Curated annotation (Swiss-Prot):
Amino acids binding Zn(2+) 1: C1404, C1407, C1428, C1431
Record lineage: Eukaryota, Viridiplantae, Streptophyta, Embryophyta, Tracheophyta
Function: Acetyltransferase enzyme. Acetylates histones, giving a specific tag for transcriptional activation.
Ranges of compositional bias, category Polar residues: 1-16, 385-398, 556-571, 584-628
Gene: HAC1
Protein name in the entry: Histone acetyltransferase HAC1
Residues holding acetyl-CoA: L1204, D1205, S1206, R1223, T1224, W1279
Native source species: Arabidopsis thaliana (Mouse-ear cress)
Amino acid sequence: MNVQAHMSGQVSNQGTMSQQNGNSQMQNLVGGGSAPATGAGLGPSRVSPVDNDILKLRQAMRIRIFNILQQKQPSPADEASKAKYMDVARRLEEGLFKIANTKEDYVNPSTLEPRLASLIKGRQLNNYNQRHANSSSVGTMIPTPGLQHSGGNPNLMITSSGDATMAGSNNITTSAMNTGNLLNSGGMLGGNLSNGYQHSSSNFGLGSGGNMSSMSSQRNTGQMMPTPGFVNSSTNNNSNNGQSYLSVEASNNSGGFSTAPMMVPQTQQQQLRQDIGGQNSRMLQNHGSQMGVGLRPGMQQKLSNVSNSSINGGVGMNAKSVDSGTSYTNPIRNSQQAYDNLQRSGMQGDGYGTNNSDPFGSGNLYGAVTSVGMMTNTQNANTASFQAVSRTSSSLSHQQQQFQQQPNRFQQQPNQFHQQQQQFLHQQQLKQQSQQQQRFISHDAFGQNNVASDMVTHVKHEPGMENPSESIHSQTPEQFQLSQFQNQYQNNAEDRHAGSQILPVTSQSDMCTSVPQNSQQIQQMLHPHSMASDSVNGFSNLSVGVKTESGMRGHWQSQSQEHTQMSNSMSNERHIQEDFRQRMSGTDEAQPNNMSGGSIIGQNRVSTTSESLNPQNPTATTCRNGNGNRDPRFKNQQKWLLFLRHARHCKAPEGKCPDRNCVTVQKLWKHMDSCAAPQCSYPRCLPTKTLINHHRSCKEPNCPVCIPVKAYLQQQANARSLARLKNETDAARSVNGGGISSDAVQTSAGAKSCTSPGADISGHLQPSLKRLKVEQSSQPVDVETESCKSSVVSVTEAQSSQYAERKDHKHSDVRAPSKYFEVKAEVSDFSVQTRPGFKDTKIGIAENIPKQRPVSQPDKQDLSDVSPMQETTKVEKEPESLKKENLAESTEHTSKSGKPEIKGVSLTELFTPEQVREHIRGLRQWVGQSKAKAEKNQAMEHSMSENSCQLCAVEKLTFEPPPIYCTPCGARIKRNAMYYTVGAGDTRHYFCIPCYNESRGDTILAEGTPMPKARLEKKKNDEETEEWWVQCDKCEAWQHQICALFNGRRNDGGQAEYTCPYCFIAEVEQSKRKPLPQSAVLGAKDLPRTILSDHIEQRLFKRLKQERTERARAQGKSYDEIPTAESLVIRVVSSVDKKLEVKPRFLEIFREDSYPTEFAYKSKVVLLFQKIEGVEVCLFGMYVQEFGSECAFPNQRRVYLSYLDSVKYFRPEVRSYNGEALRTFVYHEILIGYLEYCKLRGFTSCYIWACPPLKGEDYILYCHPEIQKTPKSDKLREWYLAMLRKASKEGIVAETINLYDHFFMQTGECRAKVTAARLPYFDGDYWPGAAEDLIYQMSQEEDGRKGNKKGMLKKTITKRALKASGQTDLSGNASKDLLLMHRLGETIHPMKEDFIMVHLQPSCTHCCILMVSGNRWVCSQCKHFQICDKCYEAEQRREDRERHPVNFKDKHALYPVEIMDIPADTRDKDEILESEFFDTRQAFLSLCQGNHYQYDTLRRAKHSSMMVLYHLHNPTAPAFVTTCNACHLDIETGQGWRCEVCPDYDVCNACFSRDGGVNHPHKLTNHPSLADQNAQNKEARQLRVLQLRKMLDLLVHASQCRSAHCQYPNCRKVKGLFRHGINCKVRASGGCVLCKKMWYLLQLHARACKESECHVPRCRDLKEHLRRLQQQSDSRRRAAVMEMMRQRAAEVAGGSG
């Protein structure tokens, strides 16, 4: 029987009829062609009452949509417009009907408009007008049941005629024995096709003639209906392995291949109708494509395996592209599981195509991606027989399996098939209602428009084939519209003669529903003011195949001339083709079988058409049942994400990347890095940022964009895991024989081979990933393997147990760190295992990014002669014939793996084997975690899976999310709470929900600037980042970077060789290597020493020795038996001069008293390191402020202990001789040593605010361990006081008092005035901020704005009380001062003990000034009475009753004590130590938060400390240090050449390689690169610091210089940058490189600038911004203190009650 297929998807002519031969076939075609119009073959109407109700509901929905359209218009519509709106409404309703999951979803009015917007934005809406009835002869044949099918001719020849009218005879001559020989009976192609095109010996009824439809096909059986109970077995043996047999059993002989489903008798077809629909539009899953795939013997394929796929664009089984480089042979173990998965997916409406990559025994192996005769996607084929040429091209649907191609949208001439189209649409509606009422969704293949992209498939010209364009009728010319959303990549197969190789088949039906009408039209209709046009030359992807011959190109060109409306698109295509041809260096496009030529049929190209790459509306979808990832728009977004990765860190010199658009995307990155504009007009900025933000936070398990991207990254990351299997020794030998064994590598579903790896999409500060490890998604990902821009070929995780049991074969989730990190998707060689008895083939993989791999491995072959856009494999027979990768220029400093030998990429390289083992043991102790968590993690050691880290034995570990604070109120946004955000980088603002709701109107204030609420993005604070992974280059095992002590910053672009600890131990013990010397990686001891650090260290070591002696004596042991703290290092890592500006309101009160406007001080950071398990761990840190003798009163000679922090990892954990913890003893000694140092330098007092951090927050070290509890304020205060008591015993501290008693009270004989002007004014202290708030409240009370009478009454009472207390001057500022002190005292009094004043020198009892010179007059009787010289003179002038002691008759004698040994000058003799990361506490905390340098466990503390030391030894190299004299661009480290004679002549690598520096008379030498240096060296660090200082000096000079011919080096260059900054329209926020670098320098300058009237541009603005950040931090700290005090008061009240 001949089953004719129609566009409607129905099965027509079901009745029994004979298949006619020859031209009589036209009778069937004509008859079939009338079916859509007349309903013939459909039977009576099956529209039930339910259908009528649905029709009424749909009509009501159309009217509702029509009304919405009318309401969106600014003016009333005329009749013509109304008709247009109704037509649009009809099309929109059809789209809504198709995407609705349930009836409730369909009618839901609350989501109607969003769904409409999604349809409009997510689809080209003109595809419904492009469906046409097709009465082609593409009928699937049901073979006669019960007869065995055999064949003996391995070389199948078929007719390749597109129609009988073209060749006169279209018969398939069948012998009486039905041997399956397909004889060429003529045809328009003039001969048999290439030997490689394999056709099944399909059984035709005896005497039926076996009419075969038009084109050659890999499998006819893919469309045949399976007949249960009948097995088509083969009678041939191995000699026939070129012949394809139809058998569903896995037990057929080695010459046969299980390729076809079983046949279904006619009696069952009606039962299948609902599931199958049109047989020509749906195909059964041809699962058992290779021999021995492992299907259950005799198992019938379930009906749910029906593929619901449109036959569009020549992709019969699959509307997607088919990868040409991966074998899809199923492993035995998991084949049934995969089979069942396919069944489940099919039941969900997720069609799968045939998987029939059939190996020939000795011929060419063509997967379903081989090219075939007709240009199905580019020509009109057989219009005599194809009465309507639709998206379905002229080939058979199963032939579409042979193409690797993308869906095609053919735009017909407007009125050509109007009648058939309308009939089809009506028929389509009837079918949808009758077939799928239960699901309320249409699964009909032709009811789906799964094309949103106009792909042009160019097919390779085969020998003996005519150019099909010569035989194409012109009645229905197809127009190729390259729309702005066209960005599909396309892959065609590359035919090969040599060696039997497998090219893959993957197919999957596309369930997405397009919406008719042009999207821009409707968008303009709905949102007439929101349409923004973009450049026609926007970035887009265009599928470009290899041109076959010039005649073919001429045909395309003639077509473009014939269709004038498409001239622009075709012009673009020709331009792209020409460009692509130029890229194809060394490839032979005209040769069909060019194994060695490197010809590529499916190429990936990013062209400059329109803005089709714009990933707009990344989350909008019009797809059903999770099949949205087959939507071409989602594929666009996937490819855009991956191309963004490539461009981020493309290693090619600028302009040298094989993809010319790489530069464009790099500019886009640079723009987005600082772009904060909500409606940025920069091309592709907004949609790209939207896509990136979605990808960053995507948690959807079925996300059609992110899941395939992650799957691709998984494929790349795990490719090396498949490289070294146990047959690696046979890897160089080629495959010899027919089949692929059942344990061959199967590419996992969802492996998208897309653009080359590059940078992660997010951020800047993150360390680079050596390799990215991605967890295999739990749901089936898109089965297609797409060829994308600059893609590489690799194989995803194998499903066989053989691979799954390998512990070095892992995957895990990728959580791209939020800032700066690089991604290296490692691509390796992989081994395709053949069936037993055959040798392995080692297939090399082309690494496609220039300069990605420095040197090729000697035993591995890199396909550098292949275009970077090619995705294919080659059988490597002669390694010496293949070129090395064009990556690195030098082979020096490389390892055996071909990677640069960068020393110290992991700190374990410095360890001895025993230290490595100790480190691993320490990892599994989980020090820092609670007991329960530690035990849980330790238990995982006994159940390590393949995904577990080989060091810590745990699979998935996530970082603590950094805290987020509300900009207006400063409150911390809680975990999992919603918030709003806007901006980027330092200018990002956050708004908590209460602040957002309290802000009325359309704007909200952020730091005084109104922000439109429309710009705010609502988010949830639930982001998680997984720990990074790294893979050993030796054993391929995966470890956490933190466990491996891997320094991503030293990874040299992802290419540094990494050896895991286990391999390292083995190599050391086998004497293959030695541990690096300790000096190879600079540590804490290598940091600069200062007088302060030496003083504290010497004191600490001395006291530890004394403590150890005391402990030995107390315990009755010898000195050596007592454990003590060892390997301690103290360093000052930052020592810079700063200025503290007095807050304006406070300054206003004391302006008449000549109060200083600013205070100069020196900020210092002191850190303590201890070597624990071989790693120097930062355990303790403190920030101090030193106000010297040159500082104005009241801060003169004062020290403020600003912040102090520690983590509880100190070793050993023992008690000291006095009972306190040894760690406490050490920390106390550090503080006492610092106070002693301050006293020796002449400082008189130290101020300490004993304020513990708020729960969940940190002062210096980010993320404390769970085992370390945050102390209460009283505990912390006692900790400080215990330290001060020790210092008092040693005579270092003279007196300890609190701030309130010293400055707010006049006790005893104190004669000092109570005024706020006496209070020491410190940066970040409690009272200056609190005073500013109080002054503001007082000013509001005076103005009557707040409290009115109540406020005035309170002020009056306060003044009266002050007057009664003896205060007489209550006017003006004096009154404000007294009121301020009164209210401030009320605020401070409850917590006065927390504000500790430490006097290092005696203070005068009368004036309270600390005495540093002259004499102090001491009372002979009173112990604590002493006054200064000035007060003594005043004392002598007083009357006797007012002299000391007051109110006593007997007066005491005073005698002088000379004050000695106090330096007059407190100036620091240490050098300035600058560190941008330690400049402020917040800067260091931000560094740690942004890079996840956490201290919550010892393992993380070790890694974090290692990275902190790296940053300290490698300060950021300043910009403009080295500039190319030719192109005037900056030269990165190791990327340039320097003249040995001229002091300032440098050229970059690009300019040097272009002209070789021939224009310069002297010799040029290459700059040293990171790989050429040892791990680090001090001289380089000092040089960088010196260069940075010079650059900052230059910045200050240039801002003041007025000379046009200044001789100051580079002065004119900086002035030019100033001028550029004034005129630049892009700015730093827009991505301007010069502006960004200038901005960086300005920020460095502003942090260090002490000039209040600085002339450097933007200096004041930057300082104001920093001030606001500090103010927010201080406000949070004060708020935390007040909350603590309220809780304390509540506790006291509750206790007393």
